[in-house]
Amino acid sequence: MTYDFDALTDRSGTYSLKWEEAGDALPMWVADMDFTTAPPIREAMRRRLDHGVFGYSIVPDEWRQAYIGWWRDRHGVTFERESLIFCTGVIPAISSMVRKLTTPAENVVIQTPVYNIFFNSILNNGRNVLEAPLTYDAAAGRYAIDWEDLERKLADPQTTLMILCNPHNPSGQIWDRGTLTRLGELCWEHHVTVISDEIHCDLTDPGFEYVPFSSVSEHCRMNSVTCIAPTKTFNLAGLQTAAVMVPDPVLRHKVWRGLNTDEVAEPNAFAITAAVAAFTEGGPWLDELRAYLAGNKRAVRAAVDEYNASVDTARRVTLVEGDATYLLWLDCSALTDDTERLCDHLFAEQRLMLSPGAQFGGNGRYFVRINAATQRERVDEGMRRLTAGLRSFR
């Protein structure tokens, strides 16, 4: 490998949410990575820093071309230049769109278990969360859409918006073209706009590709807003740089108005520089990162398999089969129906910090989410602590 992902990083003193909240525990919870970002990004930011003047920034065409080139070359999708709008983050954009595209007390559909901040973006704006729970096949370790339930909820006249997580967080599943097409047609039929959060799209396992929602049909393209960013992929969450892609001009104008009204459409001094460097020079680093993360996920699976082989069937756990993200979703239903209690136990006894699943809705209370985006040494130590904690949990 050209890049040393095994090199331990010390994030103490950097005001890291992930590490400061954990104290002396090993944090494998919030979704950021413990790797330094790609060298071309650091070099571009260093040049910008050395300039020494940090006034207001514009959004140049170079930024749009960086996004267009990346999605064309990596995902085979062509974005129109005018369809791209800068925003300071995917969640600020989603919250803004919930306000702009719906009215108070209308329903916003989400497929649970799903990224917990979706709930905040809906409830904090006075809209109703309408869960369309995914069905779970425990034997296969996979989720699927309950089409009858989803259509019933989309058909409710009070339902005007759906937030899709593609690829899915926390399960790591990649939605296939057929699934996305069917979902898009239902939303079109029932006049429900789709926000597709695709922030994890570049973090697929080697050999797997995600399918952009807007690419599967004209209805999906014209009835959706796609949220994208370099932040998850290149570990830039603290730089507040993202984009929304909106092909339909009428919908685009509404989204643009909302983002500007909410003052989340102006870049800071480093946002453009980092994004352009990521999407024009970050490919080789990302390919090695994906391979490294796949190795980390194999290490987690091996530890789970070893644990399962050493305990009674009644105490075994199951990893959901995911092909994207660095997050793993662990089914602990044989041990508890309250993984908040399990996570408290792991934190107190093993000094290991994981995410309890109840916050993701649906059947999440039976699961914990594991962040494997750290050095292999820490992954191995985390799995040692996890399996020891599972054995002692009662």
Give the label of every model feature segment.
Residues 2-89, 96, 278-281, 393-394:
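N-terminal small-domain helix-loop-helix segment of the aminotransferase-like
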Residues 54-185, 202-203, 210-215, 219, ...:
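Conserved core of the PLP fold type I
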Residues 218, 222-294, 390:
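Conserved core segment of the aminotransferase class I/II
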Residues 276, 292-301, 319-332, 364:
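Conserved glycine-rich beta-strand-loop-beta hairpin in the small C-terminal domain of fold type I
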